[in-house]
Each structure stands twice: as C-alpha cells, then as structure tokens.
UniProtKB/Swiss-Prot annotation:
It comes from Salmonella paratyphi B (strain ATCC BAA-1250 / SPB7). Substrate binds at M50, G198. Catalyzes the phosphorylation of the hydroxyl group of 4-methyl-5-beta-hydroxyethylthiazole (THZ). The gene is thiM. The lineage of its organism: Bacteria, Pseudomonadati, Pseudomonadota, Gammaproteobacteria, Enterobacterales. The keyword ATP-binding applies. Belongs to the Thz kinase family. Pathway: Cofactor biosynthesis; thiamine diphosphate biosynthesis; 4-methyl-5-(2-phosphoethyl)-thiazole from 5-(2-hydroxyethyl)-4-methylthiazole: step 1/1. GO terms for biological process: thiamine biosynthetic process; thiamine diphosphate biosynthetic process. This is Hydroxyethylthiazole kinase. GO terms for molecular function: ATP binding; hydroxyethylthiazole kinase activity; magnesium ion binding. It is an enzyme of class 2 (transferase). It catalyses: 5-(2-hydroxyethyl)-4-methylthiazole + ATP = 4-methyl-5-(2-phosphooxyethyl)-thiazole + ADP + H(+). Transmembrane segments: none annotated. It comes from the Bacteria.
C-alpha cells in the first residue's frame, strides 16, 4: 500500500490540542539524552517527568498521561524497572511508547524489547534497522545509526503494527507512520538533525506524549513527526552547525506555528 502525505493542517490543529492538554509524559529514557528530551517536550508544551527509580516509577506510570521506554543505555536493573513500570501503565490503560535503540545489534536488548511487546505499546518509534530487527525481518545495524532507508523497512513496520495493534514510526529522510492498514509519510527536516545526539530519542518522547491526545492515534503521531520536521527545517536555516542548531531547534519548537509554515511552503 502506498503511503499518503500527512496533512499539515491537521498537524496545526493537533498542536493546539497538545499545548492545551500539556500531557504529563513519564520518560524512562537513556542517560545521554535526558536533558534534551525534557527540553524538547517543554518547548512544545508538554510536561516531562524523568522518573526512573523503580520504587517511584511504577506508581508514577499510573498517574502520568503517557510513558516512554527508551532502551539506549539499558542495564539489567533498569530493564527490571522498565518492565515493572510498563506493567503499571498497561494495567492503568496509560499509553506507552517503545524506542528500541540498537535492538538489532545487541541480544540482551533485543530479547527485552520483544518481551515488552506482549504489553501492547501504543506506539513504536525506530529507524529502519531497528524496525526491521524488531519485526524479525533482519538483524544488525550500527547502534543508533541506520543502515537501511526508511522506505525499505515500511513492509516490516506495517506487519509489526498489525501484529501488535499499534502505531509504528520509521524515521529517516522521510518518516513513515503506519497502523498496518493506513500509512502516512512526513517529509522535511534537515541533515543537521542527524549531527546531534538525541533528536530521534526526543521524537519518541513527543510521539509518546501525542498518544495521550484524544482522536485518531495515527494522525496524532504523524502530527508529532511533522512538528519535529518543521522545527528542524526552521532551526537549520539560522544555524551554522550542530552547536548552534540545538538552541535554535528548541526555540523553533517553542515558536512553532504550523499554519504559518503551511503558508510559506
């Protein structure tokens, strides 16, 4: 099935609801991107909470609006905490999102992520290599870097979405968002987004937060991808390199006006 182009008008409408709700987003993410992820959520209008201790994380998951599990710096003890927290979110019917960082390259995290799938994530966000590995269609990849084009992983993403009954996002030069039946494409962004650490992990947090919104989950998640692409483009236009891109990107998220972007593109 051919993907449809995501509508920016819908993304503008969704962003208004997102900012009004300010979803409380519980992030169990990796140590490298904690600050950038929290700042990304804040800049867009969400409320991040970086609660990781298992004593606190399990009960907190039941009161948050959404949960992100990112396995970038996974350890055995952290895996236990994540599993217990996901169980709490699942029991409380809180949507949770999986970011299976480097799932194809390392066996421990691959087995852990596959085990978590039984707890029905609302969304999965990964690059092409990660989605191919999680679906069982391929192993490998170079950690957080992808060795595959996003489009090559689309059949795997669609099959995984149908199997788990969730939204799957494959990110790349063009992002693809699918529920297994319908697929949306989101072009845009800028190569500078790949020259800093954390844009993909931060996107996963925004995807998680968007899953707390009412309405069609596919459209909400695609809108989240659209916001990040638009902010990346805007930031790159006033950046000289990776160092100046990060603050420009956060500013672009904070000032993001999708309707104005529609008028100029």
């Amino acid at each position: 099935m051919q993907p449809d182009l995501h509508c920016r008008t819908l993304a503008a409408h969704t962003l208004k609801h997102f900012r009004a709700l300010s979803p409380l987003t519980h992030c169990m993410t990796n140590d490298v991107v904690q600050t950038f992820t929290a700042n990304t959520l804040l800049a867009l209008g969400a409320s991040p909470a970086m609660v990781i201790d298992p004593v606190e994380a399990r009960p907190f998951a039941a009161i948050a609006n959404a949960l992100l599990v990112n396995v970038g710096t996974l350890t055995a003890s952290r895996a236990d905490a994540m599993r217990a927290t996901v169980e709490s979110a699942y029991d409380a019917k809180i949507p949770w999102t999986l970011d299976p960082v480097a799932v194809g390259a390392l066996e421990f995290r691959r087995r852990f992520c596959l085990d978590l799938l039984s707890l029905r994530p609302a969304a999965i966000r990964g690059n092409a290599s990660e989605i191919l590995a999680l679906s069982g269609m391929a192993l490998g990849g170079r950690g957080v870097d992808t060795t595959e084009a996003a489009l090559a992983a689309l059949p795997a993403a669609q099959a995984l979405a149908r199997q788990i009954d969730c939204i799957v996002v494959v990110t790349g030069e063009i992002d693809y968002v699918t529920n297994g039946q319908r697929t949306l494409s989101i072009p845009g962004g800028d190569p500078l987004m790949t020259r800093i650490v954390g844009t993909g992990c931060a996107l996963s947090a925004v995807v998680a937060a968007s899953c707390a919104l009412p309405g069609a989950a596919l459209d909400n998640v695609a809108s989240a991808c659209c916001w990040m692409k638009l902010a990346g483009q805007a930031a790159a236009e006033r950046s000289e390199g990776p160092g100046s891109f990060i603050p420009a990107f956060l500013d672009a998220l904070y000032h993001l006006d999708v309707e104005a972007a529609n008028a100029t593109n």
